[in-house]
C-alpha cells in the first residue's frame, strides 16, 4: 500500500509540528509548509525522510499552489489530508491595534485557509476518502474580548467549514475543523494581552455546566494533533479539544445573549 500523504501549513511549530511528528511516526509522507526556513530546518533534522519542506507565506496563493503541486507530484497526485493550520494571534483592544496587524491576522488566518482549500481541491478530488481540515478555535465559541479580529477569523473558518462540507461532498471530500482551547504554543505566548481588564475576563466566567472541569485547561499541541488523526478516521464536522468545549458550543449557540451577558458581568 502506498504511503498516505498530508500537507500541513504552519508545520514547523506548535500544532503543525506536533501533527507532522504524529503522522510521520504512523508512516505518512508529510509535506511541511511554514514561513520560517530556520524552523523548517529544525523539523527536517528531526524527520530525516518522508518530509519535504516548503518555505511559503500562505498569503501568497501562487507560492502555496506551487508547493502543494510539487508535493503531490511526488505522490502521483495523491493528497489524503490538507491541514490548513497556519495562523497568528495578536492581542489588544481593536482600536489600539495598527490596521496592518489586523490585516495580517485576516490574511494569514482566513485568506491562507481559502488559498489552501483552492490549491488542494484538485488533488483531494483525486484521492479516495480525502479530508480537508482547518484549525479554528474555541474563540469561535466564546468571542474573545481583546482578540476581536482573531475571533472573527476563527468564526469565519467555522462557517466556511460548514459550507464547504456540503459543497465538496459531491466529490467525496470530507471537510472538518479542529477547535482547540488555550494551547501551549508560540502563537499564544506571543498573543498574551497584559491589560488586566481583558486578561482576567475568561478566568471569571461562570461555567455553563458544573461538570465541565477541563474546559479552560491549557492544551498541548499533541492533543490537537491526535484530534486531527481522529478526524481522518472519523466523520464529524467539528473536533473540540478538549471535548467538553462541544457542550459549551451548543449552549452558546442556543443563547448568544446570555453568553454575552456572562462575559460583560465577568469584567465588572
What function would you assign to each model-found segment?
Residues 12-13:
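Conserved glycine-rich cofactor-binding loop
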Residues 170-240:
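SDR active-site lid
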Residues 122, 166-169:
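Alpha-helical segment proximal to the catalytic Tyr-Lys
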Residues 56-66, 99:
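The beta1-alpha1 cofactor-binding region of Rossmann-like NAD(H)/NADP(H)-dependent oxidoreductases
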Residues 93-94, 98-106:
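Substrate-binding pocket helix/loop in short-chain dehydrogenase/reductase
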Residues 137:
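Residue(s) in the substrate-gating loop at a strand-loop-helix junction
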Residues 117, 153:
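Active-site helix of classical SDR
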Amino acid at each position: 500500500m502506498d504511503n498516505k500523504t498530508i500537507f500541513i501549513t504552519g508545520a514547523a511549530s506548535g500544532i503543525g509540528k506536533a501533527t507532522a511528528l504524529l503522522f510521520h511516526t504512523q508512516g505518512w509522507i508529510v509535506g511541511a509548509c511554514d514561513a520560517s526556513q530556520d524552523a523548517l530546518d529544525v523539523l527536517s533534522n528531526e524527520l530525516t525522510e518522508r518530509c519535504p519542506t516548503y518555505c511559503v507565506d500562505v498569503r501568497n496563493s501562487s507560492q502555496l499552489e506551487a508547493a502543494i503541486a510539487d508535493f503531490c507530484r511526488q505522490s502521483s497526485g495523491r493528497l489524503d489530508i490538507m491541514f490548513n493550520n497556519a495562523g497568528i494571534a495578536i492581542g489588544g483592544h481593536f482600536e489600539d491595534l495598527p490596521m496592518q496587524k489586523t490585516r495580517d491576522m485576516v490574511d494569514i488566518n482566513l485568506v491562507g485557509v481559502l488559498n489552501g482549500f483552492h490549491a488542494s481541491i484538485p488533488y483531494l478530488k483525486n484521492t479516495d476518502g480525502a479530508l480537508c481540515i482547518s484549525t479554528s478555535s474555541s474563540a469561535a465559541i466564546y468571542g474573545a474580548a481583546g482578540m476581536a479580529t482573531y475571533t472573527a477569523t476563527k468564526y469565519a473558518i467555522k462557517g466556511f467549514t460548514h459550507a464547504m462540507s456540503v459543497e465538496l461532498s459531491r466529490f467525496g471530500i470530507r471537510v472538518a475543523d479542529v477547535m482547540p482551547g488555550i494551547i501551549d504554543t508560540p502563537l499564544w505566548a506571543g498573543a498574551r494581552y497584559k491589560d488586566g481588564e481583558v486578561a482576567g475576563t475568561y478566568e471569571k466566567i461562570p461555567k455553563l455546566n458544573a461538570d465541565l472541569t477541563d474546559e479552560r485547561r491549557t492544551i498541548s499541541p499533541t492533543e490537537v494533533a491526535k484530534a486531527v488523526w481522529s478526524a481522518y478516521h472519523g466523520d464529524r464536522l467539528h473536533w473540540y479539544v478538549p471535548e467538553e468545549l462541544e457542550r459549551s458550543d451548543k449552549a452558546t449557540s442556543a443563547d448568544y445573549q446570555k453568553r454575552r451577558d456572562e462575559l460583560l458581568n465577568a469584567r465588572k
